[in-house]
Amino acid sequence: MLLASLASLGVFALVAWGLSRRLGWVTAIALAGCAWTVVVLGILTLLPAQWGTGVVPAESRADTCSLDYGGPAPDGFWILPGSQRLLNIAVFVPAGALWVLGVARWRLGWLLAPAGLVLLGLYSVAIELMQLALARIDRACDVTDVVDNVTGALIGGGIGIVLALVLRPWRRR
């Protein structure tokens, strides 16, 4: 996971560098950073949490997503101590913040910002459905994760508004 995340960081750093001349450094870094966080979210959530998962028998595989909102979540996770719900919120904050900051330079930013946050929510739904379909990765599909991810994206969107007001990407090139 770490190697894939670092390799993709190198790629998106080059993308930001290439865009910075045309869009300004704030927008270039924000948009490339948002794309990188979306890739890292996929890496974190669609690879097995532990290697050697083995085979998940069809009989023990879930047929549907858990609709038990706030149901049992582990107390900790290897990346971040605390609750898994806190982690699910935290991982979507950067994507929401960077997206809003990245589109703030354009007049259509007021339309693009909420559209991007909706897409982040749909991305969370897609991740959960893939976790359901790919039983071999031994992950669970849970509505609580979607709610927490959307909450994180919205918090990030609020942070992105504040960052846009401070950094004013529309004034820099």
Where on the chain are the PLM-derived regions?
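Non-cytosolic membrane-interface motifs at loop->transmembrane helix junctions
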Residues: 137-148
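Bulky hydrophobic segments
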Residues: 1-138, 158-173
